[in-house]
Amino acid sequence: DLFQFGKMIECANKGSRPSLDYMNYGCYCGK
């Protein structure tokens, strides 16, 4: 949903990978 999508983009912005990679693999921040 949009909430999870927004969290993935936020995570991607804090990481080293582009946001598209996070949309493909999911966000693993904090794990």
From Swiss-Prot:
The organism encoding this protein is: Acanthophis antarcticus (Common death adder)
Summarize the subunit comment. Heterotrimer of alpha, beta and gamma chains, each related to PLA2.
Q: What is its main location?
A: secreted
Q: Does the keyword Disulfide bond apply?
A: yes
Compartment(s): Secreted
> What would you give as a GO molecular function for this chain, any one?
phospholipase A2 activity
Q: What is this protein called?
A: Phospholipase A2 homolog P-elapitoxin-Aa1a beta chain
Gene Ontology terms describing biological process: arachidonate secretion; lipid catabolic process; phospholipid metabolic process
Annotated GO CC locations: extracellular region
Described purpose of this protein according to its UniProt entry? Heterotrimer: Snake venom phospholipase A2 (PLA2) that has presynaptic neurotoxicity. Inhibits nerve-evoked twitch contractions but not responses to cholinergic agonists acetylcholine and carbachol and to depolarizing agonist KCl. Causes a fade in tetanic contractions. Displays a triphasic mode of action with depression, enhancement and blockade of neurotransmission. Does not display myotoxic activity such as changes in baseline muscle tension or inhibition of directly stimulated muscle twitches. All subunits are necessary for maximum toxicity.
The record's comment on protein family reads: Belongs to the phospholipase A2 family. Group I subfamily.
Which keywords are on file for this protein? Disulfide bond, Neurotoxin, Presynaptic neurotoxin, Secreted, Toxin
Q: Name the organs or tissues of expression.
A: Expressed by the venom gland.
Misc remark for this entry?
Answer: Preincubation of P-elapitoxin-Aa1a with monovalent antivenom or suramin prevents or delays toxicity, respectively. Antivenom fails to reverse neurotoxicity when applied at point of 90% neuromuscular blockade. Treatment of P-elapitoxin-Aa1a with 4-bromophenacyl bromide drastically reduces enzymatic activity and toxicity, presumably by alkylating a His residue at the active site.
Where does the source fall among the domains of life?
Answer: Eukaryota
